[in-house]
Design a protein with these regions (language model features):
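A short, Lys/Arg-rich alpha-helix, primarily the initiator
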Residues: 211-250, 327-343
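Short amphipathic recognition helices of helix-turn-helix/homeodomain-type DNA-binding modules
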Residues: 293-342
């Protein structure tokens, strides 16, 4: 844990291991494979693969990364698409799983995958994406590993049209309307509202010659110690209380929140821990909080939902519609070029 989608050139991703979509003969292919060979150093990588020989479908082997910003290259032998009736899905899932097992074998803390089989292998991108997300998610729920799925475009995202249309409408109704106001489209309404407010204030002023109301008793300044005594729960205290109230294991919550075990341990050991906002929102999803409960959790960390944040509106949509799968939430955020939740 965690699992994140990024838009990047995989040869430039800094990870312990980079996954190469390989053929059975471990020969240089086109597209992503060619880019990896060129960045690593064609002669060195070719010689290393020739020394291994062949590899079966759905399996993976390891070579040094040579010129890449990584320690290893895992060569995962991917299936080509032949209509879906020849075991392609099982072979593709096995290719991901074999590469992930190599990450454990070589004590990697992070690994970066392209969307295997989706290029020249002809696998339908949405189906390839679902297999990637399902296989990676299942693995990282049981292992401490950061996994990056490196995507070049949005075409592969398996977001249903109905869900996407619903999110679009929600954003239009909230985020876009709010920003229209910010940029002057609601200026006339604000001016009218301000006029009404001034008229109401005028009406509330005492008439000339009226008997003045008795002066209010002066407020005494509270001591700093008194103010500190009235502080609410810290973020850490509230988070741990919410976990206990729901009878959940710590590991279940941080995995469902896309948070690493090490990160959770830091929070757990520091009552005054100051989290990033994306961390708070990730725990809100992982704990299946309502919007009101999330507002309270944000407040405990010194944050609030921002009407001017598209990310916040997407998260609010997910909370309102009880979408608590962190990868589905992050897929929507990725679709809108927003920072993902978790690590």
């Amino acid at each position: 844990m965690p699992f994140l989608m990024i838009r990047n050139d995989i040869t430039k991703v800094a990870a312990d291991a980079i996954v190469n979509p390989a053929n059975r003969n471990l020969l240089q292919g086109s597209g992503t494979s060619r880019a990896i060979y060129q960045a690593a150093g064609e002669q060195e990588l070719t010689a290393s693969c020739e020394a291994i020989g062949r590899c079966d479908w759905g399996r993976a082997v390891c070579t040094p990364a040579f010129g890449l910003p990584a320690k290893y290259i895992f060569h995962a032998v991917c299936p080509a698409w032949h209509g879906g009736g020849f075991g392609e899905a099982e072979q593709l899932a096995s290719a991901y799983h074999s590469a992930l097992k190599l990450a454990a074998k070589y004590h990697c803390e992070s690994v970066a995958f392209p969307l295997l089989s989706s290029g020249n292998y002809g696998y339908p991108k949405e189906q390839a994406f679902r297999i990637a997300v399902d296989t990676i998610t299942q693995y990282v729920m049981e292992h401490d590993l950061t996994v990056y799925l490196v995507l070049y475009d949005r075409d592969s995202l398996a977001v249903s049209r109905k869900l996407f249309a619903s999110v679009e409408e929600y954003i239009d109704d909230h985020y876009v309307a709010q920003n229209d106001e910010s940029y002057g489209f609601g200026r006339r309404r604000r001016e009218l509202s301000e006029r009404r407010r001034l008229l109401e204030e005028d009406a509330a002023l005492p008439m000339l010659g009226a008997v003045p109301a008795p002066a209010a008793a002066p407020r005494t300044a509270r001591s700093l110690e008194s103010l500190m005594d009235n502080l609410g729960e810290s973020f850490t205290t509230r988070l741990l209380r919410l976990i206990d109230e729901r009878g959940l294991k710590d590991s279940t919550v941080y995995k469902q929140s896309n948070i690493s075990r090490q990160h959770f341990s830091k929070i757990q050991c520091n009552r005054d821990y100051n989290p990033k906002k994306k961390t708070v929102l990730a725990f809100a999803v992982g704990l299946h909080l309502s919007e009101d409960e999330t507002i309270d959790l944000l407040k405990s960390a010194g944050y609030a939902f921002s009407d001017g944040s598209k990310r916040d509106w997407i998260v609010r949509y997910c909370l309102e519609h009880k979408i608590y799968n962190i990868n589905q939430v992050n897929t929507l955020l990725f679709e809108y070029d927003q920072e993902q939740l978790g690590a």
